[in-house]
From Swiss-Prot:
<dbReference type="InterPro" id="IPR035984">
    <property type="entry name" value="Acyl-CoA-binding_sf"/>
</dbReference>
<feature type="domain" description="GOLD">
    <location>
        <begin position="381"/>
        <end position="524"/>
    </location>
</feature>
<dbReference type="InterPro" id="IPR022408">
    <property type="entry name" value="Acyl-CoA-binding_prot_CS"/>
</dbReference>
<dbReference type="GO" id="GO:0034237">
    <property type="term" value="F:protein kinase A regulatory subunit binding"/>
</dbReference>
<feature type="region of interest" description="Disordered">
    <location>
        <begin position="318"/>
        <end position="343"/>
    </location>
</feature>
<keyword id="KW-0472">Membrane</keyword>
<feature type="region of interest" description="Disordered">
    <location>
        <begin position="444"/>
        <end position="464"/>
    </location>
</feature>
<keyword id="KW-0175">Coiled coil</keyword>
<feature type="modified residue" description="Phosphoserine">
    <location>
        <position position="13"/>
    </location>
</feature>
<feature type="coiled-coil region">
    <location>
        <begin position="450"/>
        <end position="471"/>
    </location>
</feature>
<feature type="compositionally biased region" description="Acidic residues">
    <location>
        <begin position="447"/>
        <end position="460"/>
    </location>
</feature>
<feature type="domain" description="ACB">
    <location>
        <begin position="80"/>
        <end position="171"/>
    </location>
</feature>
<comment type="subunit">
    <text>Interacts with the C-terminal cytoplasmic domain of giantin/GOLGB1. Interacts with PBR and PKA regulatory subunit RI-alpha. Does not interact with PKA regulatory subunit RI-beta nor PKA regulatory subunit RII-alpha. Interacts with PI4KB, TBC1D22A and TBC1D22B; interactions with PI4KB and with TBC1D22A and TBC1D22B are mutually exclusive. Interacts with C10ORF76 and RAB11B.</text>
</comment>
<dbReference type="GO" id="GO:0000062">
    <property type="term" value="F:fatty-acyl-CoA binding"/>
</dbReference>
<dbReference type="InterPro" id="IPR014352">
    <property type="entry name" value="FERM/acyl-CoA-bd_prot_sf"/>
</dbReference>
<keyword id="KW-0443">Lipid metabolism</keyword>
<feature type="region of interest" description="Disordered">
    <location>
        <begin position="13"/>
        <end position="68"/>
    </location>
</feature>
Length: 526
């Protein structure tokens, strides 16, 4: 009869699952135990899902399904849904290749798959199946036999049935688990690497910002320092111009006359020489000013130390009009202007008269000298040699004094000198005496401070006082210092403080073996 179809010869694909009945059942298919992993105990009350088995919904069933899902996840290493997806993929790939399920097993797989996708069978929503559709009727009957089985139970039964039919599922899932673990390791390693890179970028960014801030601070400090230095330079330059203008106004006439004598008719050379003289005059003035300031500081410090040592008490008696080491020096640049010689100590009668009648009129203020150098030493000595009286020999241990009286028509004294091969001491003094002789004279003396002190030891105070009264007063214009006049010409000028005699001292007392030849010239200007 046509209705009697050999069902075992049919092969139908339903919902992606192939149903191919096998005439020969696999050995051990009937009643074979479910092949689950040894570490996972079998679920109580959940068999192979035979047809007609119905599960009543309830709290106990739900708890049992959840517990079974946890056990499977612990053993297989995947969640239930992920494990079901792997099992379904394995079934589609390996069906008919790695394993050959029976017709009933295929019906069971299809029914469980439908239960997972659509839930329990509902005849109202399912399409009608023809009377002769044997496979459709078997499939619907198997699906209906599952009853109200939950989705989780259906997935569990599907995995168990597939594991029973094909033990290779365990290896398949294990390989995916290993792959998943490796992927997780790679993901964690990548995440750690990105985190380290992010931390490194943040660190480098912070270091770069710190370096930029430090660089900006350094540039700002350098800019402030450059601005401060430039302002200081401009201030000093302005101060220098003001001082030079004041000094040049005082020496303009002398320098112009001196330059006219050196380069007559050559205006350009005269201006060059005047600028050189003005610059040297400024340098000399600043040096003297610094020396005065330093001497004031040292004197103040020494006085403070003396006060600390001696206490608050001061000496009861002091000498009258005696110049001491701690006397304040002038601060207007006119160093050594009023330096008094020890020869100017007042005698007792003069001191008493000064105390009774008050001080006499002071001497005129002495202007500071101007001194400079110029390198034309060879030409200077050649010119001076033409006048034999302008070349003098200062023997060893001697001091030669050139006395130059002031001239009635003069206002300034100029001097120039040089030596052959060695330096010599030089200084200028002004003697307050009215000399009837206007001629220049040269005096030689064997100066020795020790000899003068020995001679003074044998002189009584009365004789010393009379001797000092007879001596004219002296003012030091230029202190005696050794000058390198064998290398360049030393020159200078000084404004007359009044009528008197200039004493130009060439001191060779420090030399024990050598005599010095001095080439000098003195003249006055109005």
């Amino acid at each position: 009869m046509a209705a009697q179809l050999n069902v075992e010869q049919l092969e139908v694909s339903l919902d992606g699952l192939t149903l191919s009945p096998d005439s020969e059942e696999r050995p051990g298919a009937e009643g074979a135990p479910l092949q689950t992993p040894p570490s996972s105990p079998p679920r109580d009350g959940l068999g192979s899902g035979t047809a007609g088995q119905q599960r009543e919904p309830g709290e106990a069933a739900a708890e049992g399904a959840a517990e079974e899902a946890r056990r499977m996840e612990q053993h297989w290493g995947f969640g239930l849904e992920e494990l079901y997806g792997l099992a379904l993929r394995f079934y589609k790939i390996k069906d008919g290749k790695a394993f050959h399920p029976t017709y009933e097993e295929k019906l069971k797989f299809v029914a469980l798959h439908k239960q997972v996708l659509l839930g329990p069978y509902n005849p109202d929503t399912s399409p009608e199946v023809g009377f002769f559709d044997v496979l459709g009727n078997d499939r619907r009957r198997e699906w209906a036999a599952l009853g109200n089985m939950s989705k989780e139970d259906a997935m569990v039964e599907f995995v168990k049935l597939l594991n029973k039919c094909c033990p290779l599922l365990s290896a398949y899932v294990a390989s995916h688990r290993i792959e998943k673990e490796e992927e997780e390791k790679r993901r964690k390693a990548e995440e750690e690497r990105r985190q380290r890179e992010e931390e490194e970028r943040e660190r480098l960014q912070k270091e770069e910002e710190k370096r930029k801030r430090e660089e900006e601070d350094r540039l700002r400090r350098e800019e402030e320092e450059r601005r401060r230095i430039e302002e200081e330079r401009l201030r000093l330059e302005q101060q220098k111009q003001q001082i030079m203008a004041a000094l040049n106004s005082q020496t303009a006439v002398q320098f112009q006359q001196y330059a006219a004598q050196q380069y007559p008719g050559n205006y350009e050379q005269q201006q060059i020489l005047i600028r050189q003289l003005q610059e040297q005059h400024y340098q000399q003035y600043m040096q003297q000013l610094y020396q005065v300031q330093l001497a004031q500081q040292q004197a103040a410090l020494q006085k403070q130390q003396e006060v600390v040592v001696a206490g608050a008490s001061l000496p009861a008696s002091t000498k009258v009009n005696t110049a001491g080491a701690s006397d304040p020096l002038p601060v207007n640049g006119q160093a050594k202007t009023h330096t008094e010689n020890p020869e100017k100590v007042l005698e007792p009668e003069a001191a008493e008269e000064a105390l009774e009648n008050g001080p006499k009129d002071s001497l005129p203020v002495i202007a500071a000298p101007s001194m400079w150098t110029r390198p034309q030493i060879k030409d200077f000595k050649e010119k001076i040699r033409q006048d034999a009286d302008s070349v003098i020999t200062v023997r060893r241990g001697e001091v030669v004094t050139v006395r130059v009286p002031t001239h009635e028509e003069g206002s300034y004294l100029f001097w120039e000198f040089a030596t052959d091969s060695y330096d010599i001491g030089f200084g200028v003094y002004f003697e307050w005496t009215d000399s009837p002789n206007a001629a220049v004279s040269v005096h030689v003396s064997e100066s020795s401070d020790d000899e003068e002190e020995e001679e003074e030891e044998n002189v009584t105070c009365e004789e010393k006082a009379k001797k000092n009264v007879n001596k004219p007063l002296l003012d030091e214009i230029v202190p005696v210092y050794r000058r390198d006049c064998h290398e360049e010409v030393y020159a200078g000028s000084h404004q007359y403080p009044g009528r008197g005699v200039y004493l130009l001292k060439f001191d060779n007392s420090y030399s024990l073996w050598r005599s010095k030849s001095v080439y000098y010239r003195v003249y006055y200007t109005r």
